[in-house]
């Protein structure tokens, strides 16, 4: 053996003892870790037990409170149902009283109503209108209403074309705007994001008020002529009628409305100066002038040329009027109060003379307390399309035959 043999022998003899020492330390380390884990698990179990006990206590405390809240909710629901029933009964009683004791129609005799033809403006004035159709209906009552949605601002107009596609909806938001929304169907208009489904039509001149009309594929509206809004001179109180082709998106005709010193016809809708309307007979315009600032005027227009064919001074007051529409040649004026209350048709004027104002029925709008910014009659559907503080509403009308004047 060499000199290193004893050292190697010593190393081999001492090696098993070193391994045994390492294993012993490892076992002790594992035991300490397991003991720590067991202690933590015990703490978690204690905390879980404590939380479970707290939850049980909280549940036991809340159950009686929930029972009391449920009883109070049932009591409130019963009271609400009772109040709703009482309100319904009161409304029926009010409707009955209004039917039994109607307010007198707004009729004021005036020399201009019964006098001869006027000398101002185009067309004949205050002459009996000769009906071009056999339409002989008048409103019996505003039967029902349906609120479609809320779209746009407090003032605007929504309508259909009575001579165009039956489903297409036109929406003109605001009293001074130049963009109209067109919806292919009513269902598209009622969607939450309706504006994304609409096509937009921009007119070359902004409209004034909410007196626009869609009729026969054209948009008829009033605008201030150049220099008309505060410009002085003859154009100070005049308006220009525009006939806009919706398909071609071009102005096909325009005409200065033949009435001087125009004022808003409706005392409660001060942004509208000319309110255009369509019925079974054609195109009409409702307006007022300073010459008689107490009453409304009515004009029959030629939809082709925008010429004024006839004009009438009506007995319907401007005060508290908010909107109007025409059915079978008869103007119906809607009145309200400020603050807004229940709207009512309280004055009518039949251009043909068949229906006298005294015989016209006073009709209240059903269960709606608001202010109409516009009303559009659709002769094809016999419905009114209303704009009430941004809400779009449809009113169904019940008709009856006109009584012949004796």
Swiss-Prot record:
Task: Please give the superkingdom of this protein's source.
Answer: Eukaryota
Question: Source gene?
Answer: Olfml3
Family the UniProt entry places it in: Belongs to the OLFML3 family.
Q: Which SMART domains match?
A: OLF
Q: Would the keyword Disulfide bond be found if you checked this record's keyword annotation?
A: yes
Which classification does the entry list for the species? Eukaryota, Metazoa, Chordata, Craniata, Vertebrata
Q: Which GO terms describe its biological process?
A: signal transduction
The subcellular localization recorded is: Secreted
Task: Tell me which species this is from.
Answer: Rattus norvegicus
Q: Disulfide bonds, which pairs? A: 135-328
The entry's function note states: Secreted scaffold protein that plays an essential role in dorsoventral patterning during early development. Stabilizes axial formation by restricting chordin (CHRD) activity on the dorsal side. Acts by facilitating the association between the tolloid proteases and their substrate chordin (CHRD), leading to enhance chordin (CHRD) degradation. May have matrix-related function involved in placental and embryonic development, or play a similar role in other physiological processes.
Q: Which PANTHER family match?
A: OLFACTOMEDIN-LIKE PROTEIN 3 (PTHR23192:SF8), OLFACTOMEDIN-RELATED (PTHR23192)
**InterPro entries documented for this protein:** Olfac-like_dom, Olfactomedin-like_domain
Q: Which residues are the signal sequence here?
A: 1-21
State the protein's name: Olfactomedin-like protein 3
- Coiled coil spans: 22-101
The answer on whether this UniProt entry bears the keyword rRNA processing reads no
A cellular component term from Gene Ontology for this protein is: extracellular space
């Amino acid at each position: 053996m060499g000199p290193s043999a004893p050292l190697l022998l010593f190393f081999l003899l001492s090696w098993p003892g070193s391994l045994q020492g390492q294993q012993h330390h490892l076992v002790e380390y594992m035991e300490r870790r397991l003991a720590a884990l067991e202690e933590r698990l015990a703490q978690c179990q204690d905390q879980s037990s404590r939380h479970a006990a707290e939850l049980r206590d909280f549940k036991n405390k809340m159950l009686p409170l929930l029972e009391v809240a449920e009883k109070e909710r049932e009591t409130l629901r019963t009271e609400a149902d009772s109040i709703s029933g009482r309100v319904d009964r009161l409304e029926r009683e009010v409707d009955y009283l209004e039917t039994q004791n109607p307010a007198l129609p707004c009729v004021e005799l005036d020399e201009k109503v019964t006098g001869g033809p006027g000398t101002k403006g185009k067309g004949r004035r205050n002459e009996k209108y000769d009906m071009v159709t056999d339409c002989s209906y008048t409103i019996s009552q505003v039967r029902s209403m349906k609120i479609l949605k809320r779209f746009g601002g407090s003032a605007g107009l929504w309508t259909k074309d009575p001579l165009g596609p039956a489903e297409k909806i036109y929406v003109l938001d605001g009293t001074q705007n130049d963009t109209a929304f067109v919806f292919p169907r009513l269902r598209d208009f009622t969607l939450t994001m309706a504006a994304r489904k609409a096509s937009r039509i921009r007119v070359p001149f902004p409209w004034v008020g909410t007196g626009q009309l869609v009729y026969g594929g054209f948009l008829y509206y009033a605008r201030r002529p150049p220099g008309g809004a505060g410009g002085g001179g003859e154009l100070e109180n005049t308006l220009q009628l525009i006939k806009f082709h919706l398909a071609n998106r071009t102005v096909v005709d325009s005409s200065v409305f033949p009435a001087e010193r125009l004022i808003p016809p409706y005392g409660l809708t001060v942004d509208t100066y000319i309110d255009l309307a369509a019925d079974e007979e054609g195109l009409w315009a409702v307006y007022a002038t300073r010459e008689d600032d107490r009453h409304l005027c009515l004009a029959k227009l030629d939809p082709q040329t925008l010429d004024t064919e006839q004009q009438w001074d009506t007995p319907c007051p401007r005060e508290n009027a908010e909107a109007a529409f025409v059915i079978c040649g008869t103007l119906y004026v809607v009145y309200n109060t400020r603050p807004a209350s229940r709207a009512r048709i309280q004055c009518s004027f039949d251009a043909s003379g068949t229906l006298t104002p005294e015989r016209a029925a006073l009709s209240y709008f059903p269960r709606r307390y608001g202010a109409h910014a516009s009303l559009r009659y659709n002769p094809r559907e016999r419905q009114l399309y209303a704009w009430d503080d941004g809400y779009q509403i449809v009113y169904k009308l019940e008709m009856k035959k006109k009584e012949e004047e004796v």
